[in-house]
Design a protein with these regions (language model features):
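Hydrophobic alpha-helix feature that most strongly marks membrane-spanning transmembrane helices
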Residues: 376-380, 427-438, 479, 493-497, ...
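Extended, charged amphipathic alpha-helical segments
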Residues: 241-403, 439-443, 458
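Long, highly charged low-complexity segments enriched in Glu/Asp and Lys/Arg with interspersed Ser/Thr
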Residues: 491-524
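A glycine-biased, small/acidic residue-tolerant capping/turn segment at secondary-structure junctions
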Residues: 424-454, 501-503
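Extended, regular secondary-structure scaffolds
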Residues: 128-137, 141-278
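Extended, helix-rich architectural segments
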Residues: 1-195
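Extended, non-catalytic structural segments that build the interaction scaffolds
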Residues: 39, 43, 58-75, 343-378, ...
């Protein structure tokens, strides 16, 4: 009996069992015991990223009307999300490029195919969003597969197209890894319909040199909005809900995984044996809490510090109108909330007291900026990258960042990890295209890459460094004969090695054209 048959028999036995209930994915056989890490770290990071973490933002309130038991929601500045969004903007923007080339020709068919795949999957925007969430939750994942349109009978209706999906850390669990490189994993795809939560558990694993993707389905009745969203529920037949989704897919002789786990730069100090990453604000949780407390206090300053005028209670009583109409009036505007009626001592019985206080806006803003400066240092930014003022609120720095800055070093460290994952993604796309026989303009991808290909990922660092200054520095180094033209073109101008070689050859050819050559061409006459 093959491993495949064993797996299918196991699925059949599951179908016969009526009591296959799983509280969460960590109760599945073969899943590492990461429940504590997700509950203590990833889920709180997600709550902070979304702007409501109950232990922080649901605070008790003591009032005369409700001396105990009342709560209110703490106002949040959401500095954690702002920090991750800024980090993602530094690392990834619309001028970043991914290329795959087989020749020096600018119209390389493989690169044209790759750009078409990226465009159809909205990669430029979607990857930026994923990068932001990855910085917040300590990890994320890309996944590639081929989508083949089916007719009503389940037959192929058109050629397949490569799809890329983008997954947060809460939708992904590694199951096998080597030196922090994840080799096998589970993806969780959850959908609510017909009164149930349906969760597809998608296993990516190896069977020798064969790459396998197997799908299981679980469902849980929807009981309310407050129930945990990570409950799997009862095992349920896949084909009853998703008849066109294959329970088992094999790719023989595969050379790469068809997903890439991406994580921020930095060690996992919470779990030494885990391949999972840490949020960029994992060591700044207390600071983020402090910024929210101060921001809430600033807002409450305007509520609690509003103008109040204390008047004698008897002055607020209604008396007959002096015009003799019999209507009742008050001496003060009863609809104006500035007045507070109190029963005063005899000495103050007729006094009207202005009880207004000065608003403490500047001390609050100074305190918030102090916390933001600490936050910047904790996540790898220069002080002032995040700041707060009374005009625009929380804002980010826009000036060019020097190469010697802390922010520059942090961004480059994150880019190195992302570059490796993006290169692996391109290899996965090419391998899927070969396996499914995909073509580009009449040529198979297998034929196009037969002689090999190169992958280049270019990050646009102009947002974090002065490009003109870098070019000037490179020219000086070349003039001093301590930097080659080829290295300058690759490192500073962003050329691929092939483009740099072609450009150097073109420059050499042009330099052979002398003034004498031009005179000969222009003024020579035939005899």
């Amino acid at each position: 009996m093959t491993i495949k048959d064993t797996f299918r028999n196991g699925v059949n036995r599951l179908a016969e069992a009526a009591d296959v209930f799983k509280k969460d994915v960590f109760e599945l056989e073969g899943v590492p015991a990461f429940r504590e890490f997700y509950q203590l770290y990833i889920f709180p990071w997600l709550a902070v990223y979304k702007g409501f973490y109950k232990p922080w933002h649901w605070v008790p309130v003591v009032t005369i009307q409700q001396p105990r038991g009342a709560h209110r929601q703490l106002a949040t500045m959401n500095a954690g999300k702002m920090a991750c969004a800024q980090m993602a903007r530094y690392v990834w923007n619309e001028r970043c490029e991914i290329h795959a080339t087989t020749t020096d020709d600018e119209d390389d068919p493989l690169d044209a195919f790759l750009q078409d795949v990226l465009r159809k999957n909205n990669f430029g925007i979607a990857f930026g969003d994923l990068a932001e969430k990855t910085f917040a939750l300590g990890g994320g994942a890309l996944k590639e597969w081929v989508e083949i349109p089916k007719d009503e009978n389940g037959n192929d209706a058109a050629p397949g197209q490569i799809r890329i999906s983008y997954h947060m850390a809460t939708q992904f669990v590694p199951t096998a890894w080597d030196n922090s490189r994840v080799k096998c994993a589970i993806f969780l795809n959850r959908e609510a319909k017909d009164g149930f939560y349906y969760t597809i558990v998608e296993w990516h694993h190896w069977d020798g040199s064969t790459y396998r993707v197997t799908n299981e389905l679980y469902r849980q009745p929807i009981k309310g909005t407050d129930e945990p969203q990570n409950i799997l529920g009862w095992w349920y037949p896949l084909d009853k809900v998703y008849p066109l989704l294959s329970p088992d897919t094999e790719i023989p002789d595969a050379h790469t995984t068809f997903f890439q786990y991406i994580r921020p730069f930095g060690a996992n100090y919470a779990d030494d044996n885990s391949p999972l990453g840490m949020s960029v604000y994992s060591s700044a949780m207390d600071t983020l809490h402090g910024t929210d407390i101060m921001f809430d206090s600033l807002q409450r300053e305007f509520v609690l510090g509003k103008k109040r005028i204390i008047v004698p209670a008897r002055a607020m009583r209604k008396v007959p109108n002096i015009n003799g109409t019999g209507s009742m009036v008050t001496y003060f505007d009863a609809s104006d909330e500035v007045y507070e009626a109190l029963s005063l001592d005899d000495a103050d019985a007729n006094k009207i007291i202005d009880n207004s206080v000065d608003l403490r806006v500047e001390p609050h803003i100074a305190g918030i900026n102090g916390e933001l400066a600490i936050l910047c240092g904790q996540i790898g930014f220069d002080p002032g990258t995040l700041s707060f003022d009374d005009t625009t609120g929380l804002k980010t720095a826009t000036e060019v960042i020097s190469e010697n800055s802390k922010t520059f070093g942090t961004v480059k460290a994150h880019e190195n990890g992302l570059r490796d994952s993006l290169i692996e993604m391109v290899h996965a796309i090419v391998e899927l295209a070969i396996h499914y026989g995909l073509q580009w303009e009449g040529r198979s991808i297998e034929d196009i890459v037969r002689g090999g290909y190169n992958v280049a990922v270019s990050f646009d660092d102009s947002i974090i460094q002065d490009r003109a200054a870098d070019i000037d520095e490179g020219i000086k180094l070349m003039s001093a004969a301590v930097l080659s033209k080829r290295k300058f073109m690759i490192d500073t101008l962003g050329y691929t090695p092939e483009q740099a070689d072609a450009e150097i050859e073109q420059i050499a050819n042009e330099s052979k054209i002398t003034a004498g050559t031009v005179d000969t061409v222009l003024f020579s006459t035939s005899e």
